[in-house]
Amino acid sequence: ETPHQGTALFHLPGLFEFYDLYALFLPLYRAHREYFYDWCAIGSIYGAPSDCLWAGGRVEYSDRTPREVLALTREYGISARLTLSNSLLRPEHLTDPDCNALCRLFQEQNDPQNGAIVHAELLTQYLKKNYPSLYLVSSTTKVLTNFNDLQRELARPEFRYVVPDFRLNRAFDRLAALPQSQKDKVEFLCNECCWFGCTERRACYEAVSRKNLGLPGPEHYCSAPGAADGYRFSRAMANPGFIGIRAIRDTYLPRGFTQFKIEGRGLGSALILEFLLHYLTKPEYQLAVREELYLDTMLDLF
């Protein structure tokens, strides 16, 4: 008998970028629920179109339209979140017609309710005023590494969820002391591959914000050990801040935490599938999921 209590809700990456993967995976998830853990579910899928001025965090490439992705998430009763986490927005950017049309669409098609992940205070207040039906998530791009800063953010009523920096994932003594109303708002970033000692995380995110706005500025080059190898799930698993399936079931759920974010925008869809297998799929059914999605007798890898 597992010691979990409650349901773990996963927030998955690539709303636009990995549309084709989710279009195959979600029907399987519905038709064969026995393949997947009964104590977890998909809470949302997050992302932004390629040309979204307000976007941040990572650059996402896709030719899928907002109406297409919303049709998919609505069909499966999953919340869609826009990653509007650009940290460098100025007042003149708030009038962008494409971003406003995007928010209107996500607000109108709100069954289930859709949300937005935000960084800039300017945009937070703008969305709260103009698109009040979108729930707001405080972005991990704020790099909240100080627990007092996290507590202040959790106390803000405008945010339904707050994603702290992954280096607070194991601050168990202070996390356990939070009231349940604030525990319900903490959304842990589970599979970060970034170096635990990184001091350039904010600069990394700002470089993406500049690109989306078309602003000049230095390119960010990651100086972390092993950066040249790119993202590796095995390295993420060795990260002191990593939260795997056992930790969720045995440590976080029993302590009253239920929200878990999986990163992955900008990666390949094969890696995203590995995340779906690790976090959602019972080990004895992982091969069956692979066979349903891509693995057949004609597939050559080499």
Label the model's feature ranges:
Residues E1-D149, E153, F159-F302:
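Active-site pocket-lining/capping segments in soluble small-molecule metabolic enzymes
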